[in-house]
Amino acid sequence: IMIDMKKILILPLLLFFLIQGSMAQTPKWVEKAKRAVFSVVTYDKNDKMLNTGNGFFVSEDGLALSDYTLFKGAERAVVITSEGKQMPVSLILGANDMYDVIKFRVAITEKKVPALIVAKTAPAVGADAWMLPYSTQKSIACVTGKVKEVSKVAGEYHYYTLGMQMKDKMVSCPVMNAEG
């Protein structure tokens, strides 16, 4: 009976340390940064739902990015923040079908929204990268990976090839570096 008791006590302790170890790997900036990621819902001319996906704010005044495919054929679009607030997309500022990216303005309902800061320099090949998914939950599971390749697009923008396993619903979620 004493051996069985040791096994019973060791298992919960082992699970506790495994959970603590996995939580420690999530960068500190995740809690703040996840509030900048939102869900996008687009509607057709009959006000029927067309597509859903993700996007994120890149400025506190409502400038945002998402994938262009979501907006094709849409009459209007709404973003839903991680807190559940709905805000309409008010203006399309630019789109690129080849790279499947769209830049737009959201009619924010607050003074400012949480935004991600675009990195000034490209990460090195082999650098750690985190995919920050949209989540309404308190805890968030980032997907980690490495930068496999960095190339230039249009002379000034960087295009990254990443080594990470993503789910379909992670399209248009931001990729973060070690600094967040």
Residue ranges and their predicted role:
Residues 23-57, 63-67, 76, 101:
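N-terminal activation segment of mature serine protease catalytic domains
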Residues 33-42, 107-114, 139-179:
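Active-site region of chymotrypsin-like
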Residues 8-19:
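Sec-dependent N-terminal signal peptides
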Residues 2, 23-24, 89, 176-180:
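Short, intrinsically disordered, charge-balanced linker/junction segments flanking boundaries
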Residues 59-141, 156-159, 169-170:
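Conserved active-site neighborhood of the chymotrypsin/trypsin-like protease fold
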Residues 2-8:
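Positively charged n-region of N-terminal signal peptides that target proteins for export
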Residues 55-57, 89-92, 147, 175:
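Conserved hydrophobic positions within beta-strands
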